[in-house]
């Protein structure tokens, strides 16, 4: 399945960001499959881009934590 990356993102950025999202979920003892993790990660990356952020570890971690809190995960 072909995915659409957010602007200026690379496949490497996606993988790096997925690790961050997975670590956050693991710390909450939440298990999801790779497809779900990728969907959440792409959403977080899109939010980061829309807010003027980049795909650095610190920025993605902050947006991911906020996103997961808002959606109730």
Labelled PLM ranges:
Residues 1-2, 72:
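Hydrophobic membrane-targeting and insertion signals
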Residues 2-34:
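N-terminal acidic leader/helix
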Residues 39-73:
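Short, charged early-sequence alpha-helical segments and their helix-coil boundaries
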């Amino acid at each position: 399945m072909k995915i659409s990356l957010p602007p200026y993102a690379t496949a490497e950025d996606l993988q790096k960001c997925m690790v961050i999202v997975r670590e956050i979920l693991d710390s909450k003892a939440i298990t999801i499959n790779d497809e779900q993790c990728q969907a959440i990660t792409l959403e977080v990356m899109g939010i980061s881009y829309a807010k003027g952020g980049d795909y650095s570890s610190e920025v993605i971690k902050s947006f991911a934590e906020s996103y997961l809190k808002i959606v109730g995960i």
